[in-house]
Amino acid sequence: MSNKRPNTTDGRTDLANGSLSSSPEEMSGAEEGRETSSGIEVEASDLSLSLTGDDGGPNRTSTESRGTDTESSGEEKDSDSMEDTGHYSINDESRGHGHSDEEDEEQPRHRGQRKRASRDQDSSDDERALEDWVSSETTALPRPRWQALPALRERELGSSARFVYEACGARVFVQRFRLQHGLEGHTGCVNTLHFNQRGTWLASGSDDLKVVVWDWVRRQPVLDFESGHKSNVFQAKFLPNSGDSTLAMCARDGQVRVAELSATQCCKNTKRVAQHKGASHKLALEPDSPCTFLSAGEDAVVFTIDLRQDRPASKLVVTKEKEKKVGLYTIYVNPANTHQFAVGGRDQYVRIYDQRKIDENENNGVLKKFCPHHLVNSESKANITCLVYSHDGTELLASYNDEDIYLFNSSHSDGAQYIKRYKGHRNNATVKGVNFYGPKSEFVVSGSDCGHIFLWEKSSCQIIQFMEGDKGGVVNCLEPHPHLPVLATSGLDHDVKIWAPTAEASTELTGLKEVIKKNKRERDEDSLHHTDLFDSHMLWFLMHHLRQRRHHRRWREPGVGATDADSDESPSSSDTSDEEEGPDRVQCMPS
């Protein structure tokens, strides 16, 4: 952690330096330059837990006074202890030259004691600032606007035709989420979940190379089959308007495959339709198309795939920053304008492309880019592990590793600042997912390395729900039901968990303060010991990979698995470079 002085101007403080900040628009250029990804910047609007978003009130005054105290302690730390040394020298000279040798020996000891006292005071101030922030984030929430009983009466009287739609977006239901049941059928980490359009089936993919289609209400698998992949299945999605008969899949082996399902509840075959030279983490579906979708890979390539063609895949773009390729972890199609799609990966930029206007000779084909301004020139290399569009395409949500979650207005111009920031979770160990929840994208939901699920109210950035989602320690995948107030989650555990608003009372967020503080401390410590972090990541990655190889060895024998339609016609990305094999591959490890 840097020893930069906190600034209390206008009541702003960077929490990593012991202070709070108001909004991105109010930050000066100098302050933005000082902000680092290792710290949690807290806007005053985030600290206010009222839905009005009022910056005023008594909390403001106390925050400013705390910021002043922190600044004074920060000045002591900055001196550490040049000013102290000068002070001691002046005192020594005033004593004259007649002091004893014993006094000379005691002076360094006194200096050390002063330094330790200064460091202890600074640590105490940081802890107090952290405690103040956590307390403000977890105070009582105001009364929700949507009330169940009045809404039920209106429905009975025929004046509320959209009861279910409104109920799914009501905070009171989200605060009553409780684990309903688990779906057990995998023998490895579950990396992907996807509901079909009707919401009756749920597809899951795993490190065990299997895909299972669940009747999640009856808690029974409808069918399960070998994916045909040779390594961890990262995504499996029903193609829309296909009668639930086609599943698209991608995996660590770089393959993009399609499974054809029959009405007799079996998988007829799987075939490879594209090949990345690097892991492929995500697919992007067009909302109404049963034949076309996009894939993105760590080789920086985006393929467009049309199942009606003899050669389904064609290269759409190679993502670059200047001349350097940027490996991709995530891709999403704008639901309101399917010509546009957004990608994120091994750097800090959200890139938006328009398929009709891609010219790699002009701005590398990019329509526009977004990035939190404090991360543009940050020394710590931030990666985007997941991004999603809102239901109407007006907003874009991006989750950064070892950082926070940011909301952008997708209609803003190139280089625009984020509009909201969501804090408290930890995104470090795996490629963490993020999603909107609610029919109008009213909430933001994310997993965390601490094994918990966090739900924020989108408008106020307040944590409104906090659930233990994974005993294995990491929650990666979160899939809202398309029509009901139901959430499916998965992670390092080998099961799928189904959540519904069946609790008798709203959550009390028990243990949230301790978890948030622990997450922030760990993030700060990792930022100070980046080399040790990389070593631990590499060890974790190698151990996990060796376990998976032993487990899957039997599936690698000839003749085992789905039919292999891997003809040479399936295109592969020839665009690869040594740049892609750096430590960033481990910074955003897949599960």
Curated annotation (Swiss-Prot):
GO terms for biological process: myotube cell development; protein ubiquitination. Its main location: nucleus. Disulfide bonds: none annotated. WD repeats lie at residues 185-224, 228-269, 275-315, 323-363, 379-418, 426-466, 470-509. Residues 1-25 have a biased composition (Polar residues). The modification Phosphoserine is found at residues 22-23, 100, 123-124. The modification Omega-N-methylarginine is found at residue 198. Transmembrane segments: none annotated. Keywords: Cytoplasm, Methylation, Nucleus, Phosphoprotein, Repeat, Ubl conjugation pathway, WD repeat. Residues 1-140, 552-591 are annotated as: Disordered. It comes from the Eukaryota. Expressed in the brain. The keyword Repeat applies. Pathway: Protein modification; protein ubiquitination. PANTHER family: DDB1- AND CUL4-ASSOCIATED FACTOR 8, WD REPEAT DOMAIN-CONTAINING FAMILY. Interacts with DDB1, CUL4A and CUL4B. Interacts with KPNA1, KPNB1 and XPO1. May function as a substrate receptor for CUL4-DDB1 E3 ubiquitin-protein ligase complex. This is DDB1- and CUL4-associated factor 8. It comes from Mus musculus (Mouse). The lineage of its organism: Eukaryota, Metazoa, Chordata, Craniata, Vertebrata. The gene is Dcaf8.
